[in-house]
Amino acid sequence: MNLVSVKMLRSDDIDPARDSKHGATEFYIVYRHLLSLGKVFDTPLAAGPIRDVALTAGFDWNSKDNRFAPRKRVLVLGPTLRFKIAPPGFLDVSLLMAKEWNHCGLPPCKAPGNEDYIGFDAYPMLHAAWRVPFALGGVPVRFEGFFAHAFRRGEDYTGRPVGEEFLMRTALMADVGAAAGSTPNRFFMGVGYELWRNKFGNQDMPGVDTNTPTLHARWHF
């Protein structure tokens, strides 16, 4: 199974683009491939609440045009437990090893003895993704999202310890097409929430913690 997520995030003037009064723009791409070990070995691996065991591999790619100018590149690999939830729902919990490279465009990162582009120490990351379907007033609804907890990964561009990073995004999505009597599982709308702590491992500085309500619209091809 493959997952590809491409997001574009536009900030307001509180987080401006470099040398600009307008908000910065960020692109974030995630790719994950789940290889079912049950299918590879042709042996059912279900046990209790677990329906399968998989191997997850993938990458993250990020770019943002603010003063910090992050260019995050991450490779991940590790096992995933896939839990039993009625389709189209799922719950996958992974323990991944990750290797990250990133960039810092701030002046202190370019000072003698510091680095503006580094490879962090390899680190473990706990990751979970879910989709729980149910009906609300006769309308098909999905509670979906993910969280990722990245543990410490060495020092940053100026030699300071990198903090543990936590990111969670959730959304409550309604099947608008089905509610309108059209094709189900095609068009969804909903509301969500993002909680991010120590963004990119930075800590004890402005702008690294976010609490963001979100609006979502999604079309399934």
Where are these regions (language model features)?
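Outer-membrane beta-barrel architecture
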Residues: 30-36, 78-82, 127-133, 171-173, ...
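Transmembrane beta-barrel domains of Gram-negative outer membranes and organellar outer membranes
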Residues: 1-65, 78, 169
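Predominantly the C-terminal beta-signal and adjacent terminal strand-loop region
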Residues: 162-163, 170-221
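Short helix-loop boundary/capping segments
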Residues: 96-162
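Residues that define the transmembrane beta-barrel architecture of outer-membrane proteins
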Residues: 21-29, 69-77, 118-126, 139, ...
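Transmembrane beta-strands of outer-membrane beta-barrel pores
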Residues: 3-14, 59-65, 97-105, 132, ...
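Outer-membrane beta-barrel translocator domains and adjoining extracellular loop/strand segments
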Residues: 14-20, 66-71, 104-117, 154-161, ...
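Short loop/turn motifs that connect adjacent beta-strands in outer-membrane beta-barrel proteins
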Residues: 1-3, 35-55, 82-93, 133-143, ...
